Design a protein with these regions (language model features):
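Membrane-proximal envelope and lipid/glycan-remodeling enzymes
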Residues: 1-400
Length: 400
């Protein structure tokens, strides 16, 4: 495989016309995100972590400044979450200090996610209209809209992971640089650990895109090396914090052993029923007076949040669809055995770890020229999420 610089790879993937379309989509998405943006989040761990990195430290100063889930260890205070959002915040914190609004970073990255989603849909063969409708579905018809608008630390992790996962899928579909694809998936992993379990999707694409075993093995090796480098970086990061390569630090969160959501440990098969309920059946809270129903901080079922996802099940089941479904199946077990379902949230935010693959399945299930049924469900999805964003952020109509 010829050595390719990243700039050349991007130039080959993106024509000038495509770049302009991506810019227009990003600007339009940014304006919508900005209009509905929430106040600066109080839980802005990654701003302080970026500040720590800039000062040559892994631990944050000031005893954690009242941030949740800060881990005191050997006289220092550590952010337990993977560090990629803090890495992206470095230039902003360097310029503006710890007063920088992490929520602003969230919507800046979110508009890039919408553009990247449009490009991913084009790569799987969607026409211009269909790609735009489904990019809008992703940005504003899933729980991505709410988490983007809030931008707290638990939410911005999803934004960063979605961005890099979608970019990895784009380059995999374009048959470009498996080393870079591995690095991009590694960046997503450094924001949300479960997304690494989607790696079979990329290996299967490499297998399909090459007709003999020698290039298959070579490109798979490049991919795994790229991914492995970032896994190694995370292990070194863990060693720098806890003195252990494999300790993720979550068991060190003060009080987690006594938390009623974790009575069987951080992960347990006993937690599966609560996730199944959250994914399939969780509804809004019904009230006897205005506004008569309101979002539940426990979440909202996936098909209630995004009715258009019903097309996931329609098929046809091409090889790409099967690979995408496999990615979902690989990621899901670690999510549904976790003690919490992702609260507080609108929708089921853990689904964002595999939403790019759900969009592939949805696109394949819809007609190439969208009919009124598909458009109606997309519009309904947009309205549901508009209700969630406005109810919670603007009016605080939400409870358990």
């Amino acid at each position: 495989m010829k050595n390719q610089t990243i700039s050349r790879i991007f130039q080959r993937v993106l024509s000038l016309r495509i770049r302009w379309k991506l810019l227009i989509i990003a600007v339009a998405a940014f304006l919508v995100f900005l209009i509905f943006k929430g106040p600066p989040p109080g839980q802005n761990h990654f701003v302080y972590l970026a500040d720590a990195f800039l000062h040559g430290n892994l631990g944050v100063s000031g005893g954690g400044m009242g941030l949740a889930e800060i881990v005191p260890f050997n006289g220092s205070y550590f952010v337990v979450y993977p560090p990629m959002p803090a890495v992206l915040l470095l230039p902003f914190v360097a310029l503006f200090g710890t007063g920088f609004d992490q929520g602003l970073m969230s919507i800046l990255l979110s508009c890039l996610c919408v553009s990247a989603t449009w490009l991913m849909l084009k790569k799987i063969g969607a026409n211009r209209s269909k790609a735009l409708w489904l990019a809008a579905l992703f940005g504003f018809g899933t729980c991505f809209w709410f988490i983007s608008s809030v931008g707290s630390s638990w939410y911005i992790e999803h934004v960063v992971a979605v961005l890099f996962l979608t970019l990895a899928i784009i380059f995999a579909l374009a048959k470009k640089s498996p080393l870079l694809i591995g690095v991009l998936l590694g960046f997503a992993f450094l924001s949300r650990l479960p997304v690494i379990l989607s790696f079979p999707f990329f290996l299967l694409l490499i297998y399909e895109q090459n007709s003999t075993w020698k290039p298959r093995f070579k490109q798979a090796t490049y991919f795994l090396v790229g991914l492995g480098i970032l896994v190694g970086v995370y292990e070194l990061y863990n060693f720098g914090r806890w003195g252990s390569f494999s300790d993720l630090g979550y068991s060190l969160i003060p009080g987690i052993q006594q938390d009623p959501y974790f009575t069987n440990g951080i992960f347990s098969l006993n937690y599966i029923p609560r996730h199944i309920y959250a994914i399939l059946f969780q509804g809004p809270i019904l009230l006897s007076d205005f506004p008569y129903f309101e979002p539940n901080w426990m979440g909202l079922g996936l098909l209630f949040t995004t009715p258009a996802f019903i097309y996931i099940f329609k098929g046809p089941w091409s090889r790409l669809s099967k690979y995408a479904a496999l990615a979902v199946v690989c990621i899901l077990p670690i999510l549904i055995t976790h003690g919490t379902v992702g609260l507080t949230q609108f929708g089921y935010r853990f689904s964002l770890d595999f939403t790019p693959f759900l969009l592939i399945l949805t696109a394949k299930g819809m007609r190439e020229n969208l009919g009124w049924e598909e458009k109606a469900l997309i519009i309904l999805s947009l309205l549901v999420n508009l209700w969630g964003v406005v109810s919670i952020i603007q009016f605080n109509f939400v409870s358990f």
